[in-house]
Design a protein with these regions (language model features):
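Mid-domain catalytic core of redox enzymes
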Residues: 1-40
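Catalytic cores of large soluble enzymes that bind and process phosphate-bearing ligands
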Residues: 2-9, 22, 63, 67, ...
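Short, glycine-/Ser/Thr-/acidic-enriched flexible segments
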Residues: 7-9, 33-37, 55, 119-121, ...
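A glycine-rich dinucleotide-binding beta-alpha-beta segment and adjacent secondary-structure elements
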Residues: 23-31, 81, 85-151
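Redox-cofactor-proximal catalytic regions of oxidoreductases
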Residues: 31, 37, 41-50, 137, ...
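Conserved FAD/dinucleotide-binding core of flavoprotein oxidoreductases
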Residues: 42-74
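C-terminal structured subdomain/cap of oxidoreductase catalytic cores
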Residues: 45, 67-75, 114-176
Length: 176
């Protein structure tokens, strides 16, 4: 489930990121993976992920580690407007990632960018990986683009399939 506001709120979210401040009214992506894979939690329990974009570095120089609980509370407070049953009573534990912890766990995720590229509007959606190259072809003949840095972005597993379809389409067009 995605919780997004108006266009103006989304623009403000990205403006906050660009200026190095934690978004005041963040948009949220959520997933309850145990609905599809119950093995991810004990019987009768579920897992829930809340995700959003934040600046990799805070303008005031603070580490995200020192702000993560406050920011996670802000996300959960907003999420509760749509899922009021998410009370402290039924949250048994939490794990909060930060840009720093993500990069520590996997140095390839520079600045904690799990979706590849920067978390800016200019590198989102059809602008991935960069404007003009969202159709999985590079300017080099027979060199195709795929992966988290391509449209639609990391966390969505379609990029490999779409790239393969483009390659097959090109190969079919070359047949006599």
């Amino acid at each position: 489930m995605g919780i997004f506001g108006t266009v103006a709120q989304t623009e403000q979210h990205y403006a906050d990121i660009a200026s190095g401040v934690a978004p005041q009214d963040p948009f949220i992506w959520s997933a309850c993976w145990t609905l599809m894979d119950p093995s991810r939690a004990p019987d009768g329990k579920h897992t829930l992920i809340l995700d959003t974009f934040v600046p990799s570095k805070l303008r005031d120089g603070a580490a995200w580690e020192s702000r993560k609980h406050e920011f996670a509370s802000r996300l959960l407070e907003k999420f509760r407007r749509y899922a009021p049953n998410m009370t402290a009573r039924n949250i048994l534990g939490e794990y909060i990632d930060t840009p720093e912890s993500i990069e520590r766990a996997n140095p390839c995720l520079v600045n904690g960018a799990t979706t590849g590229g920067e978390r800016t509007l200019a590198q989102s959606g059809c602008f991935r990986p960069v404007p003009g190259y969202s159709q999985y072809r590079s300017p080099v003949r027979s060199l195709y683009l795929t992966g988290a840095s391509c449209h639609p972005g990391g966390g969505i597993t379609a990029m490999g399939m779409v790239t393969a379809q483009e390659i097959l389409r090109d190969l079919a067009a070359k047949k006599p």
